[in-house]
Amino acid sequence: AGYEPLSLLMEQREADSEKGREILGRIAEVSGEIPVYVASNEVLSEISGFKLARGMLCAMRRRALPKMEDLCGNARRIAVLENVVNPTNVGAIFRSAAALGIDAVLLTGGCSDPLYRRAARVSMGTVFQVPWTILETKDWPEHTMKQLRKMGYHTVAMALKEDSLRPDDEKLHNVEKLAIILGTEGEGLAADT
């Protein structure tokens, strides 16, 4: 997924297993030698704050986030998340985006981080597959919406209104580039969006 491993924390039984040695070998091939820390399951649970089901944690360096213009350049369908604060919801949206063929996800600064453990877990790993970036807070919504329209996107809001179109409405079938905007939990989209 393009993330650089920094260190590995694992149970002794995992370090001694064939699978564990295989994983360590693959990491060494790609990234060279990294620090490997070994401890009992109890110590790992205490350090991490949760029970490790697989007995292994890897700290990774975050990639630099792409610019919106680079991310959306060749994309046809994008999702824009406005202040979706619950990591579970962010993960579920990424999983749905992957299933629906969404090419990229843009998140406002008020959104939960897609790399939070809960978001990544609920997404079933799709946060590492669907390209995404975080928008500059100062640019949302006015500048970002102008930029999307300038790039050829039609913007549509996921909102329950009397004049709403169904997602399968024929008016949307021939739209070349579509930006689907989803609002925060509870209140939905802000009035100025």
Where are each of the predicted segments found?
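Active-site/ligand-binding-proximal alpha/beta "capping" segment
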Residues: V156-T193
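Alpha-helical elements of the RecA-like P-loop NTPase motor core of helicases
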Residues: S45, R118, A191
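Glycine-rich phosphate-binding loops that contact phosphosugars or nucleotide phosphates
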Residues: C58
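Short glycine- and Lys/Arg-enriched binding-loop motifs that mark or flank ligand-binding interfaces
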Residues: K51, P87, R121, A179, ...
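RNA substrate-binding interface of SAM-dependent RNA methyltransferases
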Residues: A1-E4, M10, A15, E22, ...
